[in-house]
């Protein structure tokens, strides 16, 4: 959801009803020139909730408000809201999971050394922690390696294989990477090292010749949950391994590993990686949240809640996506993701808290770097014409490679156009990170660019909404032109106006603290968004908090409400039409209802 807000915290309210509108992002404020802002103005539009479905859900015992929200998200039967573990898709349905279990069981029985090759984001870190904890619980001799992304690049490269070989492994296991590592797997094979690829990214035309590949998106895999995250794939491999070890009577004392204890990590990685929350993913997330709220979590997860100032007893998808996840990601962006992994695998609570506090400091540093880069990006967009351009490709020689993905995402949110941000890599290369909009599959677009310009893309990979690319240092302008050409073809004639989807007007009886708490307990995320409502209000009072957040007192149908819009430092008109969320706000030990505005406009 996108909002119109003022972007400079130093601005002050300019009179009772005057206001300036500009696009805002969740953390850092951005300002476009007024003509661009007007062109990019979004539209509030209600989702369609099929009335007979709403009635069916209500009759089956679903709360009327939730029934309306769920129906608008495609839920047809109450059974789809049953998030018990028994509802998970079976491990054998994931192509390669059974073979992976056999490979791992053989390695455990032989006492073979395994080395996990991890990715450097939250999904990769949680997948590595799940693998480390799960494999060790079944007796494996397992270690991990997460090479510096800036020195060794992404995936199982030949250089990483050479580095891992010093640890004398007999089996390399990738988590959240490896599906594009054709050369790396070949290098491991030459050294006599077996390879197990666990990944969820889209494969290229050629698969690596690994001993086993587990990836729901590989050819011949009919696993229904194509959106499972890398940590989810590894969790499924462990489920299959436990079943295999059970068949081999490896748990003769009856003490089977409790893999459910890893679901806090699975939930964290799933939400933070912004994969689509289909029912299978919602089960994983729901189970993880339930364990967090009950205090059953890894010491590192508990420490991350403390470092972020969040209450684990009220854990929500928001906490994982916007509080815990960014702190883990900060390690991979600015330092070494081994710091994040150590936080998740240590059983020492004091050590976990120390690491979490260090991660919090890194995240603060990341925000400062990001703010500077965003200012550079906006300067480059002074002459951007949304009437002519359907994409943006930005580059600055001093940009930090670990933060370009965030900047691309911020600018994409503002322009509602596919965006790449580039930074210097190694050996005369530029590293690019891209973010897309729903109408354009980013990896497919890159594949088309690659086929038309075979010498332009050195490497690329990713998903529909996010992708990475490496190009020669001097070819940025060529890439920008080639990418724009492909985007024009794929989006030509498509209405890409930004829309704020809402769940419509909220009845007065449900504008309550109880309703806010009820909604916070549910599972929300990408593809199953948290509810946003839209209503008209009268603004009775307004003031600035910390010179950057607009605090309002509103009235509607005789009721009064407190509301806030973050990163908004201009005044609201007397009558507004607002898109908002219900929030339980705690202040000085008192909890009350607060409306969190996503966007407002004159009524």
Residue ranges and their predicted role:
Residues 106-110, 351-394, 427, 440, ...:
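Mid-to-C-terminal polyanion-binding domains and interfaces
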Residues 2-4, 17-19, 32:
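Aromatic (phenylalanine/tyrosine) cluster motif
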Residues 42, 46-171, 191, 209, ...:
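Hydrophobic helix-and-loop "lid/oligomerization" segment in the mid-to-C-terminal part
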């Amino acid at each position: 959801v996108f909002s119109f807000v003022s972007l400079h915290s130093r601005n002050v309210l300019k009179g009772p009803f005057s206001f300036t509108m500009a696009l805002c992002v969740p953390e850092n404020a951005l300002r476009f020139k007024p003509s661009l802002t007007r062109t990019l103005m979004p539209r509030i539009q209600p989702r369609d909730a099929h009335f007979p479905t709403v009635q069916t859900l209500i009759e089956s015992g679903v709360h009327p408000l939730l029934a309306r929200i769920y129906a608008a998200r495609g839920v047809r039967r109450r059974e789809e809201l049953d998030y018990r573990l028994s509802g998970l898709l079976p491990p054998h349905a994931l192509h390669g999971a059974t073979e992976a279990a056999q490979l791992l069981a053989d390695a455990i029985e032989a006492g073979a050394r395994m080395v996990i090759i991890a990715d450097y984001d939250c999904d990769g870190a949680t997948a590595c922690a799940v693998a480390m904890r799960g494999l060790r619980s079944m007796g494996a001799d397992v270690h991990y390696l997460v090479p510096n992304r800036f020195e060794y690049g992404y995936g199982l490269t030949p250089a990483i294989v050479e580095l891992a070989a010093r640890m004398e492994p007999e089996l390399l296991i990738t988590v959240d990477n490896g599906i594009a590592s054709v050369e790396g797997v070949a290098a491991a094979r030459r050294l006599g090292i077996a390879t197990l690829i666990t990944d969820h990214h889209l494969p290229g035309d050629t698969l690596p010749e690994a001993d086993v590949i587990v990836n729901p998106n590989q050819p011949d895999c009919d696993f229904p949950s194509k959106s499972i995250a890398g940590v989810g794939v590894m969790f499924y491999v462990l489920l299959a391994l436990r079943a295999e070890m059970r068949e081999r009577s490896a748990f003769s004392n009856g003490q089977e590993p409790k893999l459910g204890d890893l679901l806090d990590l699975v939930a964290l990685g799933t939400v933070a990686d912004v994969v689509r929350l289909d029912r299978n993913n919602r089960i994983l997330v729901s189970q993880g949240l339930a364990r967090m709220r009950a205090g059953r979590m890894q010491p590192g997860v508990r420490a991350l809640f403390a470092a972020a100032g969040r209450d684990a007893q009220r854990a929500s998808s928001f906490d994982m996506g916007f509080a815990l996840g960014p702190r883990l990601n900060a390690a991979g962006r600015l330092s070494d993701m081994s710091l994040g992994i150590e936080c998740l695998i240590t059983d020492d609570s004091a050590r976990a808290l120390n690491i979490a506090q260090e991660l919090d400091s890194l995240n603060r540093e990341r925000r400062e770097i990001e703010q500077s880069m965003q200012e550079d990006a906006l300067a480059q967009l002074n002459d951007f014409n949304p009437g002519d351009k359907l994409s943006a490709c930005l580059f600055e020689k001093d940009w930090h490679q670990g933060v370009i993905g965030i900047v691309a995402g911020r600018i994409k949110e503002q322009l509602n156009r596919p965006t790449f941000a580039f930074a210097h890599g190694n050996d005369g290369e530029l590293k690019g990170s891209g973010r897309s909009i729903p109408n354009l599959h980013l990896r497919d677009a890159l594949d088309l660019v690659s086929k038309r310009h075979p010498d332009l893309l050195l490497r690329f990979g990713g998903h529909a909404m996010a992708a990475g690319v490496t190009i020669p240092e001097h070819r940025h302008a060529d890439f920008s032109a080639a990418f724009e050409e492909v985007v024009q073809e794929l989006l030509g004639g498509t209405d890409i106006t930004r829309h704020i989807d809402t769940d419509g007007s909220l009845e007065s009886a449900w504008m309550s603290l109880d309703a806010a708490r009820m909604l916070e307990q549910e599972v929300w995320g990408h593809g199953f968004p948290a509810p946003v409502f839209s209503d008209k209000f009268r603004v009775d009072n307004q003031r600035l908090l910390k010179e950057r957040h607009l605090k309002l007192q509103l009235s509607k149908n005789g009721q009064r409400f407190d509301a806030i819009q973050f990163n908004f430092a201009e005044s609201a008109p007397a009558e507004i039409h607002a898109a908002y969320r219900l929030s339980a706000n705690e202040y000085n030990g008192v909890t009350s209802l607060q409306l969190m505005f996503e966007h407002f406009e004159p009524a």
